[in-house]
Amino acid sequence: MTAPRAPGFTLVEVLVVVAIIAIAAGVAAVAWRDDPRATAEREARRFAGALEYAAARAQWRNETLGVSADGRAWRFWRRADDSARWLAVADDDVLSPRSIAADHTLVPLAYAGQPLPPDALIPLRPSGRNEPYAFVLDGAGIRLVVASDPLNHVSVVAANP
């Protein structure tokens, strides 16, 4: 007759479970690793969504808005009613200033077919009739153009460096 086994797991069973957990953790780490292209596309889409929202808000509220990008962040502006001064938009979470990923830059590229300086402010009119404009997002060997057409549809396309 054999002695009864003590309850619990054998060493082999414990090692098999540890091996399975290690393999799963390795697969998860590879899957969650930050892909530079995905980061750039996410930043560009986030900016494109804010541009479409700003163009619609300019029409809804009958106000002239503007957008600028200084390389590290973008910001939306509202033209003061009494002058040509631009005031930072502070009453809207979507249009609040946003920083972009550390290894990326965002600058204006063109407005109405003309190249722009890096400190340019692009207007978004209350009529909805805006000139085509574009911004360029560079980083990690990736260059994306965020462009708007006259109907305020914003697209993100890969550009040749």
Protein language model annotation of sequence segments:
Residues 1-3, 12, 16, 23-49, ...:
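N-terminal helix-rich module
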